[in-house]
Design a protein with these regions (language model features):
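C-terminal scaffold of the Radical SAM
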Residues: 1-227
Length: 227
């Protein structure tokens, strides 16, 4: 009943640099298809801090995305991890926005969405006032997992496709990154998981505390002790 689309940025030069060509019209069309199919809540993800981005170019992206009237926006800080992502090794690091520019871009984003009818939730999400995500923070029921904010605290996340990550109370698991390996596992009737991590009791506690602070910016010590 809800879909999330990754957009990142609409600037053509930025898209070429990050090897992710995704015209605005394509995003516009799939969102219309989702609406026509009865999907009641649509989220779009944007990223600031990408190569060749400027405050001005990202403002243009925000203005254009606003016309899509999506129910939520998630605006993440770009994480440059070339030791994990081979494609990032091709990026010219001199083209990244400076840290102070990224802070200005974040401020621009907050000002833009909050002045256009959206509410800021947590560190990087912007839902409409009637969205259940905003209602959750008013009730103190907002949660966060490694993908962002959610109203479904404690629910297992099941990764299905290539590279997808799943997690439960005490584990993380990632599927094969190679399509052939993923298909081979499926054909054999196996889960296409190639690595995982089991959390210790101490790590589970630390995770709960961190996520609670990131979600509600406060900590109920009694509740932590009960958990």
């Amino acid at each position: 009943n809800r879909l999330s689309f990754g957009v990142q940025d609409l600037d053509e030069e930025v898209q070429k640099t990050i090897h992710r060509i995704q015209p605005f019209e394509l995003t516009q069309n799939v969102i219309k298809i989702a609406r026509d199919a009865g999907i009641h809540s649509v989220n779009t993800d944007l990223i600031y801090g990408l190569p060749l981005q400027t405050r001005e170019s990202f403002k243009r992206t925000l203005e254009k995305m606003l016309t899509l009237n999506t129910d939520r926006f998630a605006v993440f800080n770009y994480a440059h991890v070339p030791w994990l992502m081979k494609t990032m090794r091709k990026f010219d690091e001199s083209t990244f926005p400076k840290p102070e520019t990224k802070l200005e871009m974040l401020k621009d984003t907050i000002d833009f969405f909050t002045s256009n009818g959206y509410k800021m939730v947590g560190m990087d999400h912007f839902p409409k006032p009637e969205d259940e995500l905003f209602k959750a923070i008013e009730k103190g029921e907002l949660h966060r997992n490694f993908q962002g904010y959610t109203t479904k605290g404690g629910a297992d996340l099941i990764g299905i496709g290539v590279t997808s990550i799943g997690n439960g109370v005490d584990y993380y698991a990632q599927n094969f990154k190679d399509l052939n390996e993923w298909e081979e596992a499926i054909d054999k009737g196996n889960l296409p998981v190639f690595k995982g991590y089991r959390l210790s009791d101490d790590e589970i506690l630390r995770q709960y505390v961190i996520m609670e602070l990131m979600s509600n910016f406060s900590l109920n010590i009694k509740k932590v002790e009960e958990e």
